[in-house]
Design a protein with these regions (language model features):
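Alpha/beta-hydrolase-fold enzymes
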Residues: 173-174, 179-262
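N-terminal cap/lid subdomain of alpha/beta-hydrolase-fold enzymes
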Residues: 54-114
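Short beta-strand/loop motif that positions the catalytic acidic residue
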Residues: 299, 305-307
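Catalytic active-site module of serine/aspartate enzymes centered on a nucleophile-bearing elbow/loop
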Residues: 329-368
Length: 368
């Protein structure tokens, strides 16, 4: 496996979301070759499969610390840049920040980047993603060893699932993780949420159950997907206390219509399903026969847990239980916000307080 500078060479017929296409066109994105990479299910990735990534800050090997920032659900690397840079949450005055794209997100190897006739990719597990990231870092000369561990793995949502996987699978390879609005595994309530948005997509006539893919963009299915997501992605008081007005929306209906529906309207549905499968499968306890206590007992990193008190699927209660299992290895700093899950991705102007809270505690973690 090796790095290559091509853009989208793994696709004879690119579809993908507009965001993914913009990310692929980024002149600084690079692709690490995953040809022949063995997935956990035993399947080998085909020739041309790659892990897309971008490096920010000082060149690797010049003495700066290393931060890994994996992407989250339906996010691509350039959408995370609002918190990367000098003086930002991930400060490139002090750290080199490496952002790998999730397999299935339309930038790394994904359904939208292959000919559907070739067959859609199987499950990309969180473990598969982290193993690919480790191979990338080793190629880049980042040791990920007990002698030279990563300074931080920072992850929001599905990125937090990956951060936890790093800490459990390779306890000596990372000094710290920050898990923002995420968890060590996908819980039962979370699975119910994922099942509902998956069912919304597949209810569209464009879904070909026999082939296991969409024959055309499922316009109605994507609208239903966005409508359901709007009930889960923010906290209950976002609606009951009309917090949406702070963000410039006239009503709850206006918020859904102008925020959630367009957010998913042009997504590639096959890529969404791939990422849903990755998310639903996530569980660090796979390393310990299903025992979460034992899995978290493997963690040697300092762990910053930042759930949102109103997150409706990565819940505060689950984070509290994980914090208790981690004990004094954990710094527990909940975000108090009506924005719910969105609070952990504070790129919107109305989330300035949430952004400041996250930055403050990441800085404190890195100072330890």
């Amino acid at each position: 496996m090796h790095a290559c500078a091509h853009h989208g060479a793994q696709s004879p017929q690119q579809r993908g979301s507009p965001a993914a296409r913009r990310a692929l066109a980024d002149p600084r994105v690079r692709h690490f070759d995953l040809s022949g990479f063995e997935l956990g299910c035993g399947r080998l990735l085909p020739v041309g499969a790659s892990l897309a990534y971008k490096v920010h800050g000082p060149p690797i090997g010049q003495g700066a610390g290393i931060v890994l920032h994996p992407t989250s659900f339906d996010a691509v690397h350039n959408e995370l840049e609002y918190q990367i840079g000098p003086g930002q949450t991930l400060d490139t005055a002090r750290y080199t920040v490496i952002v790998p794209n999730l397999l299935g997100n339309g930038v790394s190897y994904s359904p939208s980047l292959i000919d559907p006739a070739a067959g859609l990719p199987p499950l990309f597990s969180v473990r598969d993603n982290v193993r690919a990231q480790r191979a990338l870092l080793e190629h880049l000369g980042v040791g990920c060893s007990k002698e030279a561990p990563l300074d931080l793995v920072y992850g929001y949502s599905m990125g937090a699932l990956q951060a936890y996987e790093w800490a459990v699978a390779w306890p000596e390879s990372v000094r710290r993780i920050a898990a923002v609005c995420g968890a060590a595994r996908c819980g039962e309530l979370n699975r119910v949420f994922l099942g509902s948005i998956e069912a919304a997509l597949k209810a569209d006539a464009a879904w070909d159950a026999a082939a296991g893919r969409f024959t055309r963009p499922p316009t109605r299915g994507l609208a239903a997907f966005g409508s359901i997501y709007a009930g889960w992605g923010v906290g209950s008081s976002w609606y009951t206390e009309a917090e949406y007005a702070r963000a410039g929306f006239a009503s709850a209906e206006d918020f859904v219509e102008r925020s959630y529906l367009p957010a998913f309207a042009n997504c590639d549905a096959d890529d969404l399903l791939s990422q849903i499968r990755t998310w639903r499968d996530a569980d660090v306890a796979v390393h310990t026969g299903g025992d979460l206590r034992a899995a978290l007992g493997r963690v040697r990193a300092r762990v910053l847990l930042m759930p949102c008190d109103q997150d409706r699927y990565f819940t505060l209660g689950e984070a509290e239980r994980e914090a208790a299992l981690l004990g004094d290895r954990c710094v527990f700093r909940p975000i108090v916000s009506a924005a719910g899950h969105r609070a952990g991705d504070p790129h919107r102007p109305e989330l300035g307080a949430e952004a400041t809270w996250i930055r403050r505690h990441v800085y404190e973690l890195l100072a330890e």
